[in-house]
């Protein structure tokens, strides 16, 4: 959650954390889904992609390389949605550098 917040990405929902059936109706409002652990949520993300065209990131952000790839994939998805607003294009390379600089 902290990484998403640091990148300025608003979280629609965290499933199953605090989720309820009433919250499910809001799932299609998301631009994309994050599946940090493939064992939990991947089938749901695949379903949402098929049904609603909602892409997902399924890289587990552990370690330097996978965390950087996780952030790059989110950057691509954010920029795909923000393509109508060129001045709002995301560039997370400085975030990746800051997070991995002293490791």
UniProtKB/Swiss-Prot annotation:
Cofactor entry: [4Fe-4S] cluster
Any single GO BP term: photosynthesis
Entry keywords, A to Z: 4Fe-4S, ATP-binding, Chlorophyll biosynthesis, Chloroplast, Iron, Iron-sulfur, Metal-binding, Nucleotide-binding, Oxidoreductase, Photosynthesis, Plastid
Alphabetized Gene3D superfamilies for the sequence: Nitrogenase molybdenum iron protein domain
This enzyme's EC code(s): 1.3.7.7
Main location: plastid
GO molecular function list: 4 iron, 4 sulfur cluster binding; ATP binding; metal ion binding; oxidoreductase activity
Cofactor binding note: Binds 1 [4Fe-4S] cluster per heterodimer. The cluster is bound at the heterodimer interface by residues from both subunits.
Annotated SUPFAM superfamilies: Helical backbone' metal receptor
Swiss-Prot/TrEMBL catalytic activity: chlorophyllide a + oxidized 2[4Fe-4S]-[ferredoxin] + 2 ADP + 2 phosphate = protochlorophyllide a + reduced 2[4Fe-4S]-[ferredoxin] + 2 ATP + 2 H2O
Pathway entry: Porphyrin-containing compound metabolism; chlorophyll biosynthesis (light-independent)
GO cellular component: chloroplast
Family from the record: Belongs to the ChlB/BchB/BchZ family.
Assembly and oligomerization: Protochlorophyllide reductase is composed of three subunits; ChlL, ChlN and ChlB. Forms a heterotetramer of two ChlB and two ChlN subunits.
Biological role: Component of the dark-operative protochlorophyllide reductase (DPOR) that uses Mg-ATP and reduced ferredoxin to reduce ring D of protochlorophyllide (Pchlide) to form chlorophyllide a (Chlide). This reaction is light-independent. The NB-protein (ChlN-ChlB) is the catalytic component of the complex.
PANTHER family: LIGHT-INDEPENDENT PROTOCHLOROPHYLLIDE REDUCTASE SUBUNIT B
Protein name per Swiss-Prot or TrEMBL: Light-independent protochlorophyllide reductase subunit B
Organism encoding this protein: Salvinia auriculata (Eared water-moss)
